[in-house]
From Swiss-Prot:
Belongs to the CCDC88 family. Positive regulator of Wnt signaling, acting synergistically with dvl2. Functions upstream of ctnnb1/beta-catenin in the canonical Wnt pathway, and also activates jnk in the Wnt/planar cell polarity (PCP) pathway. Acts as a non-receptor guanine nucleotide exchange factor which binds to and activates guanine nucleotide-binding protein G(i) alpha (Gi-alpha) subunits. This promotes apical cell constriction and subsequent bending of the neural plate during neurulation via arhgef18. This is Protein Daple. The GBA (G-alpha binding and activating) motif mediates binding to the alpha subunits of guanine nucleotide-binding proteins (G proteins). SUPFAM superfamilies: Hook domain. Residues 11-131 form the Calponin-homology (CH) domain. Residues 1022-1033, 1497-1518, 1564-1585, 1714-1727, 1752-1763, 1785-1799, 1809-1824, 1989-2014 have a biased composition (Polar residues). Residues 1013-1035, 1441-1824, 1837-2023 are annotated as: Disordered. Residues 1442-1460, 1890-1904, 1974-1988 have a biased composition (Basic and acidic residues). The keyword Coiled coil applies. It is found in: Cytoplasm; Cell junction. A motif (GBA) lies at residues 1700-1728. Residues 1478-1491 have a biased composition (Pro residues). It comes from Danio rerio.
Amino acid sequence: MDITVSELMSNFMDSPLVVWVKTFGPLGFSSEDKLSMFMDLVDGVFLHKIMTHIDPSPMNQRVNKQVNNDVNLRIQNLNTVIRHIKNYYQEHLQQLIVMNLPNVLAIAKDPLSGKSMEEMKRMLLLILGCAVQCDRKEEIIEKIKLLDIETQAAIVTHIQEVTHNQENVLDLQWMEVAEIPAEQLDPLSRTMAFHLRKLIDERDESAELVIELTQERDYLQSQQPSGLLGFPSPERTSLSPITLLSKEDRQHLAVELADTKAKLRRSRQELEEKTEQLIDAKNEIERLDSDIQKLKQENTQLLAEARSVRAYRDEVDSLRERAGKVDRLETELSRFKEKLNDVHFYKTRIEELREDNLTLLETKSMLEEQLTGARGRCDKLHELEKENLQLRSKLHDIEIDRDSDKKRLEELLEENMLLEISQKQSMNESAHLGWELEQLAKNNEVNEARKSFVFELNESASSRLLKLEKENQCLQSTIQELREASINMEEGQLHSLELEKENQSLSKKLERLQSQLDQEKQTTQDMENLGEELIKEKQRMEKTLETIQAEKDRQISELEQEKEHLTQAVSSLRKRAQANSEARVREVETENRILHQTISETGGKLARLEAEKRQVTKELESLRERGERCEELEREVPRLERVREQLQREAAALKIGSERAEALERENATLEQDNRRLKKLADTAQNATLRLAVLEKDHQQLEEENLEQRRALETLRPAAARLAQLQQEHAELEREHEEMCRTMEELRSQAKRSERLEKSCGSLSLENQRLQQTLENSSTKMQGLESELRQNEAEMKDLQRELEGLRQKVTWAETLEKENRGMEQELSQLEKEKKQLEKEARRFRQQLEVKEAALEENCLRLASMEKEGTALSKELGRVKEAAGRLKELERENKDLQKQATMDKKTLATLREELVNEKLRVQQQCNELEKLSHELEKIGLNREKLLQEEHSCEDNKYKILETKIESALKKTLELREEKIQSLESRLEESSSLNQQLRTELTTVKKNLEALKQRHEEEAAHSEISQQTLGQTRSLPDKEKWEMEQREATAELLKLKDRLIDVEKNVRQRHVSIDIHRVIFSIVICFCDSLQNAALQTEKYLLKDQLKQIDSQNAQLNAQTLALQKQAASLQEHNTSLHKETAKLQVENSTLSSQSSSLMAQYGALQAQLQTLESEAESLQKQREEASAARDRVTQDHERLLGVHERQASEYEQLIAQHAALKASQRALEQENRTLENKYMVLLKQKDAMEALEESLQRDRESLGEEIRKNTLILGENRSLREEVDRVSHMHTQLRQEYDSLQLQTKELKTSLNESQLELNRWQARYDQLKEQHQGLDISMTKLDNHCELLTRLKGNLEEENHHLLSQIQMLSQQNQTLLERTMESKELYHEEQKQYIDKLNSLRRQKEKLEEKIMDQYKFYDPTPKKSRQWVGAKAIAKFIKPKKESSRERPDAPRERIRSAPDIPLPEIPTCIDCPESAPPPPPPPLPPRQSRPSLDSMNSQSVEENHVQSPTLSSPALNGRVLNESGGSRSRDGYRSIGGGSESMNGYEELLRWRSREPGGATCSTPLSRNSHNAPGFTSSSSLRPGRRPKGLVSEEDLRHHSPDAGFGSGVHGNTGHRPSSAEFSRNTSSSNSPVSSKGSLDCLQGRSASLSSDDVVGLAHEGSRLSQSSLLPRSSTLPCDSPSASRPSQRPASRRPSSPGSEMVTLEEFLQESNALSPPTVQTGSREDLMTDYFTRSTRPVPLRDGAKTPTNYVTPTVKTTPPELDARTPKPGHSVKPSVRLTDTSTPPSHSQTLPNRGAGLRPSALQQSSPRGSVGGSASLSRTFSLASADLLRSNGPDSYRTEAASPNQNDVVMRRPGAVARERPMSARVTGSSPLPGDPGHISVDPRRLSLAQPRDEFSLVSPPPLHSSSMSLQAEREYVGSGSSRAGAARSGSAQPRGAPHRGEVAMVTPVRAVPALRLNDLEEEPQEQREAESPLLKKADTTNLSYASKEQPTSKPASPDPNNDPQTVWYEYGCV
């Protein structure tokens, strides 16, 4: 019970509520004594103290402080506390306690119960609720916060229970509220209903309880009288004094009543006095309140006055300050003006920075390009690393092979040596045998038998010799092999040495690389740091810019506000002037103040602006510095790039590092293997150690195994040492490996870092751009601010002027007024302040007195408190000491209790042990007795048996027995003594007992071991005796004596042992076990004696056996009976002993109990005696008290009478006092009212006086104000005039400023534009510089060419004479043909006229061209001043005569076809050049079936049948110009004439036609159809064949299509997109980029030109082709075998027709040769009419796929040409050889002539298409010469610089557009006749990529392939007859005749037929040809669409001033040049 109470108390005292209560003060006497603390709480005094602290109101009742465990007082205290709590909740907190109040009875009666503690918790909870909601709650909460977190949390939950839980405490504040919202009403009503239900339940329960209590009372009352009667006498006697005492009580109660009445009176009197005091105090308070209100009013008035005075003062001061500030502001303004100039400077600086930024951006783009290159190199590095790894692996394999070879070599050397030795031996043997043979030959005289023997020997020797010879041969071969192997080995060793050297060098390089890497690391780190700094600076700049912007915005807004204020002020001034004078003056004053404020604000703002300007300047400086830093960084960037490039160059060195790394990896692998091996060894060692441990355990049993283990250990030790070493080595190697890995990772990280740096550079550049943008924005804002500043300055000036005027007036007006007012106010204020100060002084004195009195009281209290504190501290000390003692006593008590329980337990155990001990002792005694009996028996038997012999031994035995008995007795005595001592010292030896027990167990074990030994020894002795007895005979007495002696010795030993054991047992107090041991030993001894006796008896008495047997049997029977009896007696004895032991223990316990009871009895008797004495003394005291009581009752009665009298007197006095008090109060009230009235009157009087004074002052002031107002009005007018003038000035200035700003902006824009142009021109200048350098190089080459050209001239002139004669013949033939054709139809009359017009125009063109040629030939002469006339041109001109005859008859249908050809309309330049995909125009009229053409966009896919069908649709976007030009044909014609007309007569044309009509067979073209080259990017070619004429060998038109390259590769808009790499490649360089049409001015003339190609350019091909096919007798073939696509097919093309053009009306050199071939069979027709001079221009750009290395013939025009046999088709004679032309057979394929167009060239721009061959002079392709050879060569000079050979080699697929008729698929017209303006279709793959930098058409370099066959090209441009359109009808008719749907283009003007040198090129394989179209399609760019259209007009303008150029003579110096003038 005690424990539970203490636990409850400790739990309660540790609860959070009690911990909180302790914060109010100390509980109990000591903080450690929980009981006293708890009792303090229960008594209620401390709780009351807490409640008074919470609610210090005087209504609270007092509490009994000294409770002294009195229940009633405790109940009273607790009730007062609860009442106080309830009142506080209801009155102060407006809350109702709903929870059950604490049960005071339970707490008071049984405070230490759990229930009372729960009730106390409830009370503390209510107090906590009061404390948290009281006025001092902050202080209490602060105290709570100082507690632990857990207690705080618990207290918070408790607070929530009280405050928030409506079930515990109900809030009544809602009753005061008028209307409760519906949201609060619902929960409130619910809680109210719950509480109501609870109250009703409690009411019902209490009603039931009352009923039960009344029933019990009634029952007890009914039972009481009967109980009293039946009570025994002593109870009655005890009840009688109660009835007697009731009278005395009544008297006592009466006295108390009187006393209480007196007290009541006193209290009433006090109450009345207090009420009176209260009323007085209330009156005093009311009076004081009224005084305070008055004082407050006065105070407010005074404050208002003081404020006004201060305001005036402040105004005066501010005005003075402002007047002083004006000068300062003016100076500041001047300063600002100066700074404006700086702002302009900064503007310029910003612009400069922008420019710098642009340059930085350009550098950034350059750097990015370099970066891309560097990245590419990095990618290559990875590939190189892979290769490096592969090479390493190969090297490793080689090394392995080398090692194996070395081993093999060594073995072979050994074998070689052995073989040499054996060979020497065999040689010696053979020599010896030879010698023997010689000897035998000499000794022929020996007998036959001997001869036969020698013969046999010779035979055997010869056979052996043969064998040896064979072996020798084998050995020699092996020796030879070994020698070779040794040589190989030596080479391998040398190679390995070289590799080692390389490795060393690589390692050095690696080291160098690493050092460089470290350097670059540092540089990269520096760069990163710089980058980070730049980023930080950028961020700072951004922040500063943002702040500047914000500040500027703020300033702008402030300035605007100021401006508004100023404008408002001006307007208010105007309004004020019109108002009354008084109002005006006040307004002026206020406005002045405002103006002064604004001026001060503007001054502050100006200062701020200055500061900001400084900041801006600083920022600009910092920006400059950053810009400089950026420039430095940009300078560093290229350096870093260089470093990076060096590193990339030295990437090879990294390979070495990787090789080393691999070697290390291999070593690492080997080391890992070693490591594994070592690990295995370590595992084995560990296993060995485990085994060792096992062996060490076994070592105790097996010493031999231990030795072996030691040996094994010794063997393992060195291995362990070796293991440690190996581990260290392995660790070192691992470290090295890790270091290598780190280095590799560092290298990688550096690579990544460099990439990151590059990215960061990019990001920095972007950030720079952004910063520059922000700078620009800031500069614009600055400009805006400057403008606003200027405006503000102007406004400021105006305002200052106004202010100056106003100041003078205001100062004059205000000074007087303010001084007067100020003086008056100061006076009144001083008076009021004086009064106030007097009152304050009085108040302070009173307060001082009160505080002094309070101080004295406090001092007294302090002293008393200190005394109490000292006393309390002493008491506390005492209480603490007492508590400490108490705790110590409690601890001792607990310890004693524990000891007592332990002692009880030990006693019980000891009792049990005693009983057991006694039993054992009795048993041992019994055993001893038995032993003694047995010993006696044994002794007797022995005496009987051995009386004579063993007398001495008997004595010894007896002595032994006596000794044993004595020892036993002694031990028994000792044991008894010890038992007694143990019983006496039970308590002391409890601890020793346990120790002894543990020791006993060990001793027992030892004894048991001893017993076993003794038994074994005894058994051993018995066995030994028995064996001895069997073996020995009876008479052997000596032996028996010896045995006896041994037995006695053993006994003696046993005795000694027993003595030792006894001693040990004595020492350990274990006598019982010793007895047992002794007993067992004795038994053993007896047994041994018996055995000995029996043996002796056996030996001695064998004779008496029979007698003794009978006796023995009887004795045995007796002994058995006796043994049974002894066993039964023993059992009985043991049971008796047990009983006796139990009885003894019981006896001892009873005796101890009786002794304790006796002691208790004695103590009780002593207590009884003391109680009796106390009872007697109490009886005496009782008697004395009864006597005193009687006396007191008498005194009390007397006092009652006195009290009654005094009460009546007192009541009378009180009534009188009340009346006097009432009269006094009435008088005081009257007095107060009178005083108030008097005060009011005084105030009224003062007010009247003040009013009079103020009125007088107002009159005076009004007069003054009227005067002032008049002055102010005049000033105001003047100010207005000034304002108007200033505003006018301001507007003018503003306008000027705006105009200036506009001008500056325009200037800036123009400056920027000019700078941009400058940059562009600079770039252009750089490009031109590069071109110039290239041209210089080419010039040197071309100078050499010029020399060669001069040599060629003579030859050419001779040739021209020869050709002119042929031309005459041809012209005659042509004339005859024309006559025939013109006779056939009347329609050709019109055509004849058109031809004449065309010829006239061509004549004009020719004349112009001749002039140009003459000009151009100046350049070919080394002395350019001398101009040579071209003799050939004049000679040719003589042959051409105009034929003006009318048309003649046409002999046959083919001529009709020829006649229809010229009517094909000419396509013109499209109107929209840049719109290639514009919609096609309406289709032309239907075409005749024989002349219908396929649609251009479907040329690739159309079948042969489609070729025969009319195709009216137009598919090329370039046809847009057709409709436009149909109406305006005449205009285009005039244009043609104006630009380049020719002077060709009709004669030549007709002769040509005649000659062609005489040609019997179809002529073949020697170049493949439409094998387009790069020289015609902007042109289209159109070839046409007649339906009736097909080439030989082709059955149908479909065959033509299939066999021609055109059909094979398809023709989009371009026709066949073939490649002519051999014959026209050089002409690409010349004519594509340098043609005379593409002059510098061509760009300007782009729009002004309508057409640049004659109308028959497109059509004339068909004419000429058809004529040629009719007239040619033999198939035209080249002397060279050109491997065309048809050549490789079974059906060869012997009669493929060449394309014709309008230019073919003039007889070209080719045609002349064809005619001569036709006339003279021995000669050969040239392969092309254009290919005479192409040989010179040919450049071999390929890696010679011509297997035989054939070289081309250079001269096809010389009369004597060496023929090439058919079998040597692939070979051609070397350049310079004179080759005779031979007639080729018809079956050999002759490639059709390849035509090409003249390319367009932009002014001053070099086409990139010409730059695709290497600059070493290997020119990538051939091109045709345009109009004149001289112009072409001049342009060649320009384009044939070092760059002109670059791109050409790689562009096989630049395309010409070929236009076809249905039946003429295998034909192609020349370049000159192709449609220049036609742009390709969108779908066409044959486009050329445009290089936008050079405005030319180029192809990628790497797309050049040796795919297309190298056909011979015609590079001469036929003169194009200009077609004149008579009208739209004639053009339409022509279109219908031609049936072509070809695109329109700008016609060429002034194109001239040229002859170029011809070079035959060896054929390529067919598969190359077949691969070509795919490559072409892939390579061609769609950009050609635009380029084609843009280049249309480029070809029209001529270039009269171009330098002469000639092809590079390096490749082909023996090429002969021929020139054929324009005819």
